[in-house]
């Protein structure tokens, strides 16, 4: 089932451009994106806060519907995954670049039926199934 709240961040006018192209037109904003991502709204796009609000709401709803021994596959994109992971770890979105989420990477989050138990991240960004130990599928991308 497709959940629109889990789509990738809207890069707005940056959509489809390589980082080098963005640097040519928006050097200061790109610098801020790297240094203070939680403060940037991409031109005609979204902010990390926008993504986090919609993705956390969707994740919480998914979690609330789980039953004993349910196995759920959630497929999402880089910014969505990173905001969910930041939220689970209780870290600021200013630290979002500390988390790698490669294209096709697998992250496993164990949920518990007891709502007082915090979900556990048991695997993060597994990419070996893509043919290499180090993921380079997004080289040059934002």
Annotate each language-model stretch with its function.
Residues 61, 65, 87-91, 112:
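Active-site catalytic microenvironments for nucleophilic, acid-base chemistry
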Residues 68-79:
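Generic beta-sheet signal
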Residues 92-116:
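Domain-level recognition of soluble alpha/beta enzyme cores
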Residues 78-82, 105:
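GST superfamily/GST-like fold recognition
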Residues 1-5, 110-142:
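Conserved histidine-centered catalytic loops in small-molecule metabolism enzymes
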Residues 29-50:
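Short glycine/proline- and acidic residue-enriched helix-loop micro-motifs
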């Amino acid at each position: 089932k497709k959940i629109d709240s889990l789509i990738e961040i809207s890069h707005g006018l940056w959509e489809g451009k390589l980082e080098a192209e963005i640097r040519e037109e928006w050097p200061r904003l790109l610098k801020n994106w790297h240094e203070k991502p939680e403060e940037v709204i991409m031109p005609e796009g979204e902010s990390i806060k926008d993504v986090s609000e919609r993705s956390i709401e969707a994740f919480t709803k998914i979690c609330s519907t789980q039953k004993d021994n349910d196995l759920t596959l959630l497929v999402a994109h880089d910014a969505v995954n990173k905001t969910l992971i930041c939220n689970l770890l209780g870290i600021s979105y200013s630290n979002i670049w500390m988390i790698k989420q490669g294209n096709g990477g697998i992250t496993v989050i164990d949920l518990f039926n007891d709502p007082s138990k915090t979900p556990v991240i048991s695997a993060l960004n597994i990419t070996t199934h893509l043919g290499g130990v180090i993921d380079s599928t997004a080289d040059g991308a934002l």
